[in-house]
Swiss-Prot record:
GO terms for molecular function: translation initiation factor activity. The keyword Protein biosynthesis applies. CDD domains: eIF1_SUI1. This is Protein translation factor SUI1 homolog. Expressed in all tissues examined. The keyword Protein biosynthesis applies. Keywords: Initiation factor, Protein biosynthesis, Translation regulation. Belongs to the SUI1 family. Probably involved in translation.
Length: 115
């Protein structure tokens, strides 16, 4: 009999790309802002924004994002990733455009991940 290379599917980890490149560096030390989407139950999804500089007020940015896109959101403190902004729904393009127009980050420093 011959040995077959069988790949067993595993759970999708949306933060795998970010953790693979990190060599113990803290969140925010890189120049990139990562905008990701996470699938929840059914058609529901969650948009996460990670990597903003620490001198920004995350709560003020979140307040403007919630008001602009009519969605709910929160700031989560993660031990590995630092502060992460979470928004309901697929807001990846909206968030990236908002961050560029507000002058928070340059367009070439935003990485959009997801489907």
């Amino acid at each position: 009999m011959s040995d077959l290379d069988i790949q067993i599917p595993t759970a999708f980890d949306p933060f795998a790309e970010a953790n693979a490149g990190d060599s113990g560096a803290a969140a925010g030390s890189k120049d990139y802002v990562h905008v990701r989407i996470q699938q929840r139950n059914g058609r529901k999804s969650l948009t996460t924004v990670q990597g903003l500089k620490k001198e920004f007020s995350y709560n003020k940015i979140l307040k403007d994002l919630k008001k602009e896109f009519c969605c709910n959101g929160t700031v989560v403190q993660d031990p590995e990733l630092g502060q992460v902004i979470q928004l309901q729904g697929d807001q990846r393009k909206n968030v990236s455009n908002f961050l560029v127009q507000a002058g928070i980050v340059k367009k070439e420093h935003i990485k959009i991940h997801g489907f």
